[in-house]
Amino acid sequence: MSDANVPLSFSDVAANKVKTLIAEEENPELKLRVYITGGGCSGFQYGFTFDEKVNDGDMTIENSGVTLVVDPMSLQYLVGGIVDYTEGLEGSRFFVNNPNATTTCGCGASFSV
């Protein structure tokens, strides 16, 4: 699949951090799963977890030999977004740069559409 057809991007910085974390866990089957749940101060919130499974209907995006997984329900809120990683004074975290979000909370962990 070419990048032009992928509805969600996985940044090099995020992929490299995932690669490091997988190496630390010594489990090459791990993949980063991004998902959306109800809650947070803006209505929806992003979640990230490591998962060994890819479920029916999940989309996978690969970068630098690691895989990002997203379920179809979450994907509809993430189309056009970029999963990225940052380290700063507020700590380190994965985040989504989401063009569909009409409002976001101050920390960027929740959003509304």
Swiss-Prot record:
Pfam families membership: Fe-S_biosyn (PF01521)
Keyword flag Repeat: no
Keywords noted in UniProt: Iron, Iron-sulfur, Metal-binding
GO BP term (any one): iron-sulfur cluster assembly
Top-level division of the source organism's lineage: Bacteria
GO cellular component, one term: cytosol
Note accompanying the cofactor annotation: Binds 1 iron-sulfur cluster per subunit.
Residues the record lists as binding iron-sulfur cluster: C41, C105, C107
UniProt cross-references to NCBIfam families, sorted A to Z: iron-sulfur cluster assembly accessory protein, PRK13623.1
Subunit field text: Homodimer.
Family, as annotated: Belongs to the HesB/IscA family.
PANTHER family named among the record's database cross-references: IRON-SULFUR CLUSTER ASSEMBLY 2 HOMOLOG, MITOCHONDRIAL (PTHR43011:SF1)
Protein name: Iron-sulfur cluster insertion protein ErpA
Organism: Photobacterium profundum (strain SS9)
